[in-house]
Amino acid sequence: MTAPSVKSALILVDLQNDFLPGGALAVPHGDEVIPLADELQQRFDLVVATKDWHPADHGSFAANHPGKEPGDRIILDGIEQILWPVHCVQNTHGAEFVPSFDTSRIDHVFHKGTERNIDSYSTFFDNAHRRHTGLAHYLKKRGIKEIYLMGLALDYCVKYSALDARHLGLKTYVIVDGCRGIELRPGDIARALEEMKRAGTILLKNSDI
């Protein structure tokens, strides 16, 4: 068993309407993690959450590039970008937390993907590491040395958050049964898990905490 310490934080990644079944960018079985997110919050002294929070003209949206389709790749502001369906547009229903998700214990919500010309999978930085979300400073100010990540999607936002957390020197756990992946390509989830492990992320299940 791994007991969270007072220097641990639970980070709930992108539990938003557009990422659940029926949403604009649905993660298969994403709804299954909501009860666990509610349960786990009771075990931590600090809980933060993130939201994808895009302007309507965001460069990652295929609809903003005539002739392009979701899944196509372009160069956006100097880095490769996968194009996605329009999702999690600021101040829309799709960008809001799932109604069944208990947000009463969340201490702070961090927004990402707010800049038009660059995406932000990680909860810490944009994809080029040019701007930060404020999460790293928030954790440091509160003496947080380790984090537990869960949410959507495992092979994108959870993975890149874990990699950045390790780069920042945080002891990083990913609660695997609290995540679901998109798996655009077969094997993406397995590759994401392996990449996180190689970076020093500790993979565990809810029952291990």
Model-identified regions with their sequence ranges:
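Extreme N-terminal starter segment of soluble prokaryotic enzymes
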Residues: 4-10
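Glycine-rich anion-binding loop/nest that anchors nucleotide
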Residues: 144-160, 174-176
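A short alpha/beta connector and helix-capping loop motif
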Residues: 6, 22-52
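Active-site alpha/beta core segments
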Residues: 38-146
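Short, glycine/acidic-enriched loop or turn micro-motifs at the edges of active sites
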Residues: 17, 55, 115, 154, ...
